[in-house]
């Protein structure tokens, strides 16, 4: 039997998603909890690996098991063995044709950026922060140059293991709400550090360091050295993974973040 899980986690509490010998990752915590509940080791396959500090609101995994248990039993039973910084939101039996990674046709990330002269300790690890004003319109104009199918080598980490740097970026939205600016990135897939590198460039344009069309040159150059430094991970959230309707994957629970109403207005889930 194949089971899919929806997982939420506080990325600040872990050293990324992927299992490591030190055991301090989200995958390590989840598989330990699943093993405790199932009384047998279980291995998970994830929709998208996230880095240290990156949060998961709509992460999806699957695993195979011979155990026949009610779907909600997997939720309650696994959560009983998880730390408070990670939680299974739903469980669903899936056909063998479902694959958490390869069945997905799109991913959506949000970035919450706090723009204020003084940082807020209440937002530590929850939102990015910059103390200088930003030009929203300039960032929107710059984002236009990135939309479409492109070689995103200029925004790719040197550690990226993707087979190709070509991705299709469907949409970038920028929305101000009080002292926050919220960004939404939707694509078929993302390269390692791609969203944080895009954020670094958009913020550089917003600060007036470069004109909006600078991003067109960075993209065309296909050279990471042309782009701005990688932006902080704190405000980055994997919010949604899109799957074909036949799998009826439950929607992510975005209401667990304070600015969920802004995100819902910015991006009603498909």
Swiss-Prot record:
Q: Does the keyword tRNA processing apply?
A: yes
Enzyme Commission code:
5.4.99.12
Q: Which Gene3D superfamilies match?
A: Pseudouridine synthase I, catalytic domain, C-terminal subdomain, Pseudouridine synthase I, catalytic domain, N-terminal subdomain
Question: What biological processes does GO assign it?
Answer: tRNA pseudouridine synthesis
Query: Which family is it part of?
Result: Belongs to the tRNA pseudouridine synthase TruA family.
Which UniProt keyword terms apply here?
A: Isomerase, tRNA processing
The major lineage groups are: Bacteria, Pseudomonadati, Pseudomonadota, Betaproteobacteria, Burkholderiales
GO MF annotation, one: RNA binding
What is the species listed in this Swiss-Prot or TrEMBL entry?
Burkholderia vietnamiensis (strain G4 / LMG 22486)
* Record flagged with keyword Amino-acid biosynthesis: no
The UniProt record gives the binding positions of substrate as 109
Look at the named UniProt entry and state the broad enzyme category this protein falls under: isomerase
Q: What is this protein called?
A: tRNA pseudouridine synthase A
Q: How does it assemble?
A: Homodimer.
Q: Which residues form the active site?
A: 51 (nucleophile)
Task: State its role.
Answer: Formation of pseudouridine at positions 38, 39 and 40 in the anticodon stem and loop of transfer RNAs.
Catalytic activity reads: uridine(38/39/40) in tRNA = pseudouridine(38/39/40) in tRNA
